[in-house]
Amino acid sequence: MTTKSFDRPRAQTGNEVFRWLSEQRQQQILKIAERQFAARGFASTTTIAVAKAAGISEAMLHNHFGTKQKMFQKVVERNSQDRLAALRKRFFSIPDLPPLECIESMAQSTILACVDDTGNASVMAWGLMEMLEFAADVYRAELGATEALWNAEIGTRCGDAFVRSRLAVHLVPYAVHACMAFGLWLATLRHKPATAQAHARQYAGAVVYVARAILNTPPGSFEGAACLARAQREVA
């Protein structure tokens, strides 16, 4: 009898036959595990609870994902990639706008991507608290990828070379770090897009304040980080 891809025998112990789950089903289980870890953290989440929520045996869970630590690491990596994919979609949906309005939309999108259902950053927050070295590496990679997305959008949408270079050098590195950190904080406080919208809009206003200052200030007379900190104090 021909078995389906998700029903292929994997291993046998006693009377139990392990069956290899399809890639789609494995991704569904990782999403379920993500919700469990996001609610309780790594230490307080048991593999029994994850298996029960997923509707599979604990043995099958371990057979596919290994130890709880390995599963948590996969969840954190997947969460970061989901957030980046969601951010790309958000950027793609931004209409043609003047540079400063585009920056405002990008800042809001970066913040709100952290509190959306897809890619919610709560599990990343737990990772940074409970598995710092691993999660920090994933987070740094996400920062770099997000900076690249910002620079690509600015390069595509801003025809003026002066505007592009000023923003890429003096705004993007600081704005991305700040927006992602703020989004992470909102996710930790259990905000959803509806409740985070006003906070994101206000914070994006600070980023626009900085961008305007950068574009209007003579070369060599400002520092992006100090300018952003000053703007944050003024809108607080």
Name each model feature, range by range.
Residues 1-12, 112, 147-160, 171-236:
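C-terminal peripheral helix-coil segments that are non-catalytic and often amphipathic
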Residues 28, 32, 36-70, 74:
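Helix-turn-helix
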Residues 28, 105, 123-126, 166-174, ...:
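Amphipathic alpha-helical interaction segments
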Residues 47, 77-83:
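Short, basic, alpha-helical segments at the C-terminal edge of helix-turn-helix-like DNA-binding modules
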Residues 69, 80, 115-118, 132-133, ...:
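Short alpha-helix boundary/capping elements
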Residues 74, 88-116, 158, 165-169:
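Hydrophobic alpha-helical connector segments
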Residues 84-85, 101, 132-159, 166-167, ...:
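Amphipathic alpha-helical packing segments from all-alpha helical-bundle domains
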Residues 115-137, 182-189:
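Amphipathic alpha-helical segments used for helix-helix packing
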